[in-house]
Amino acid sequence: MAAVCDICGKGPGFGKSVSHSHRRTSRRWDPNVQTVHMVTRPGGNKQQLKVCTSCIKAGKVTRG
């Protein structure tokens, strides 16, 4: 699944998961991406986008 925000372009972050014995394994942190129906203009068509919750909280998307 491609966890990329259509508004800001935020994608997954990569790093290591470190256990108690300090064994390191690769992992990724995906942004919280939600499917949103967005109104392109008043009275216009709705468009389905994948948007991160930080963009929704910032008001960059008008849901409809």
Swiss-Prot record:
Alphabetized UniProt keyword annotations: Ribonucleoprotein, Ribosomal protein
GO MF annotations in UniProt: structural constituent of ribosome
Superkingdom of the source species: Bacteria
GO annotations of cellular component type: ribonucleoprotein complex; ribosome
SUPFAM superfamilies named in the record: L28p-like
BP GO terms, sorted: translation
PANTHER family for the chain: 50S RIBOSOMAL PROTEIN L28, LARGE RIBOSOMAL SUBUNIT PROTEIN BL28A
UniProt cross-references to NCBIfam families, sorted A to Z: L28
Family to which the UniProt record says this protein belongs: Belongs to the bacterial ribosomal protein bL28 family.
Protein name: Large ribosomal subunit protein bL28
Gene designation per UniProt: rpmB
